[in-house]
Amino acid sequence: MALDRGAVLLAELRLALAEEPNETAEALIDRADAQLDRARELAQAGRLRGSIRAATLGRALALEAHWLLSRGDAGARVERAIDAVGELLEDLAVELGPDAAAERAELETARAHWTEAAAAWKAGELVRAEQLCRLAEAAARRAAEEAGTP
């Protein structure tokens, strides 16, 4: 599911890129796509921890491209990012093993930031919501990086 959600986000970004060319965003999207491909390969090879790390990095790169390309409606941009980070957190919660205490602690930090981001968005505090969303994504990435190290 994590790879599917990553692919959906990349498809959305490629459509946005067609409307709003941006070399930096295109490079981020290409790197994200490569990471998702790597995640698929690692999953097929039975290397789940490495796959989690690669998929999360791919989605993080995609979110960076999202911030670059989504210059229109700020509320919609932040809302989509909050949704994407929420999906990332859901997937990580499922994929992290029961023995992953340190990773789960980072995941809880990410969830706390994400919850605050969603509340800030609902309150119309878009700058704060964006900052908290970025903090949530960074904590999720740290959890995945810890999961990827044996």
Model-derived segments and spans:
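Long, charged/polar, soluble alpha-helical segments
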Residues: 1-150
